[in-house]
Every structure is written in structure tokens, then in C-alpha cells.
Amino acid sequence: MDTSVLLLLAVLLSFLLFLVRGHAKVHGHLPPGPRPLPLLGNLLQMDRGGFRKSFIQLQEKHGDVFTVYFGPRPVVMLCGTQTIREALVDHAEAFSGRGIIAVLQPIMQEYGVSFVNEERWKILRRLFVATMRDFGIGKQSVEDQIKEEAKCLVEELKNHQGVSLDPTFLFQCVTGNIICSIVFGERFDYRDRQFLRLLDLLYRTFSLISSFSSQMFEVYSDFLKYFPGVHREIYKNLKEVLDYIDHSVENHRATLDPNAPRDFIDTFLLHMEKEKLNHYTEFHHWNLMISVLFLFLAGTESTSNTLCYGFLLMLKYPHVAEKVQKEIDQVIGSQRVPTLDDRSKMPYTEAVIHEIQRFSDVSPMGLPCRITKDTLFRGYLLPKNTEVYFILSSALHDPQYFEQPDTFNPEHFLDANGALKKCEAFMPFSIGKRMCLGEGIARSELFLFFTTILQNYSVSSPVDPNTIDMTPKESGLAKVAPVYKICFVAR
């Protein structure tokens, strides 16, 4: 059924509910915002290019704290560096509740390390952090895994020299294999059919979640969930991924050695066995399944998407790529493999990677939250369970911190002496208690993959760099890089 028809039906049904129930009552004192229409809320003020653009425009008119109505549902928007930091750092506990993403709700059901709330989340987070310590962040092993994967990518690119190709698939392979190594304890060949199927499902799902149709579903999910649409396609895709995860979990269970856990799944299974008599434990099969699903989806797509944007920017600004290569040649040379220790000696390359993350802005709104208790924030009383979005894009493009916020310029992260400078507006992984748990791995991947590729290859575009369009393929909860062609030429 056409989206416009479903939307009309949704409005009509909402009108009937409005007549029966009247206005929803909200105690507290929500911040003002654009005047909503009955039933429609602020829908007509939303840009089809994505809600993010609309929220930035509303920020200019209503300030950093305002309320937008998704249909009849009030949602508080927080914009600007200082506002977001105040909420997520100074009021961290109050803003730590995870909100619901309607298109994912049927499959996630508030389970998993990123979708549970309060105490349940803290328990699973501790396990995840411990597992990343043992199998990922802070260990030489994860750096070795990334370097080995980068080596495989360099070898694969030899098969494509001089040929224009879409790099999306290859970037998915390398980031997907790092997550697979940590979660499943194995990596896959780039031609493995099962691996390719999983990557295709994840990419299509990521694009669907970021689509305008998905944003419309967030507004009218109570009605649209009964009809065919983007939510059912997402469910179908993720159900197939879950079937694979379930099969892997059973294989892990059959070969589990309590004295030698191999990966995240093994570690979780050991906790399940330890707490099998606890009826209230968070270590149960479905939490394991959803945690692995989310790690696989977020860990693969967000980093590969950033790499796609990064190399598109190198095509558009070839002088930047040349300057990065000059620093690589000076610090690393052509023979030695890049290491994470090189970061401290390569301020320009680090500034370029930071600017890629800032400019590409792949997670413009982060994940929604719900207030855990009645909270006085900037003069407004936000009731418990108030839905809140943090417009991270407004910080990454904050003119108070970035002289040219809408221009790609690595100088944003360099001081007068050419050293890398910190910036509190830089929050691509969010901040506070709910910041991305995989930040350390993602930062390591971006540096090692980026430098290894440019150490071995120069890049060129089959089109004039001045004509390269940076408009995202989709822009919603996430921004999906546009499809493009790139040519890798051995140095």
C-alpha cells in the first residue's frame, strides 16, 4: 500500500482516537517549540530529506531545547554542545534510560546491551566492557586482528587495480570481520557466501532504518504496524541474521570449554551457566541473541559507513589525501605496517580522521532516551519517561567550536603549532554513560584501515572531483554514504 495512503489512514485513525480519548495529559513543564497541529503534530514541518535537517532549522528559531510533536506524541530535542554535555554528563543518570526505536521494537523488544534499561543495562554493560577488555579494546590482539585484516584488504585491492569500484562491500568486509572475530571468534573470506549474505542484510537494514519511510513509521507506528511497510522488511532481514546467530550460539554451546572462552558468545554462555538458577538473571538466551545482533549491526555498518565517507572525501579533496600520504611516508615509510602507536606522531592524519567523522556525521541523532525520573533541566520540568533526542549533529556543526562548520577542513582539529587539539564538541560516539561501547575499536579501525590503504594505494575518481556530490543516500537515525566509484592505484 502506498505510503501516502497509509499516512492518510493513520491521520484518520488518530482523529478517531482523539475524539474518543481527548488530549494526552502530560504533567511537568515541557519546553516550547513549533506549534503542533491536532493529530499531525509537527509533521508538516519535517523535511523529506530527513528529520535532522528540520531539527537544525528549528534550533535556529527555538533555541537549544524545544519540543516537537511526532503526531500527538511530545518529544524533547536537545541541541548544541553545552546543552548535550549538560544532559549526558551533569545529569547522566536522569538521561540514561533508553528510548524505543519503533522499527526495531518487534525484534529487539528492549533486550540486548544497547536496548535494556537502568539496572539491566548496567549488568550487561559490565559484561560487554570486560569482554572487550579480554578480546578487544586495550589488548594487542585486537590491534593485530585489525592489522591482519588491513593486510588482507591490501591484497584484495591488487585484484582491482585500475578498475573503478564501489568500495562499500570491501569496507563492510573488513569491519564485519573485526566484529566477527570478537563476537564469533572467527573471520570470513571475502567470498564466503554466508558472510556476503549477512553483510547484504545488514546494509539493506541500515539503509531502511535511515530512510524517510522509517522516520514516518516512528511517528505513526501504533497504526502503521498493522500494514505492510519498511518495518516488516527490517524484521524479515534481522530475523534471518538472528537465525544465523542462533546457529552459531548452538555451535558454541556444543564446543564450549569453561577454562578457555574464545569470544563474546562463550563469555556470555559461561555467565548463563553460572546464573542458571537465578530466575531474574539478565544472562539468558534472548539477551545474548539481541546483544550479538546489535553488536554485529552497529559494529559493521557505522565504521564501514565512515570509511566510505572518508574515501569519498579523499576523492573530493585530493590535496588532503596527498598530505596524509606525505605524513605516512615520513613517520611509517613504505615497508613497515602502521600501528596504533603511530597516532601520536601523526597529528595531521588524526585531524583528517576526526574531520571525516565530524563532517560525515553518520549518527546525527544518536539513539533516543527516556528520562528515568522527573528532572529539572534548564528551567523545564521533564517528567519521568519523557522521550528525548540528542541532536549530535548540532554539536558536530557547532559554529562556536568550528569556524567553518559546513566545510570539510582538517584544520578544525589542529592548533597553531600543527598539533592535534581536543574539542568538546567532537562527539561522534555520543558522550556519557550511554556513549558507544565500541568507540575504542572503531577509532582503532579507522586509523589502521585508513593509513594502511593510503600507504599502499593512491585513490582517484572517474569523475571530476568538483562534481562529487556528498548528499547521503539516506538520512534519518543514521546517514548512509552515497554510492560512488573509486580507483585504487598501487604506489
Curated annotation (Swiss-Prot):
Keyword Kinase listed: no
Keyword Zinc-finger in annotation: no
Main location: endoplasmic reticulum
Identification of the protein by name: Cytochrome P450 2B3
Protein task: Cytochromes P450 are a group of heme-thiolate monooxygenases. In liver microsomes, this enzyme is involved in an NADPH-dependent electron transport pathway. It oxidizes a variety of structurally unrelated compounds, including steroids, fatty acids, and xenobiotics.
Induction note: Constitutively expressed.
The protein's enzyme class: oxidoreductase
Gene that specifies this protein: Cyp2b3
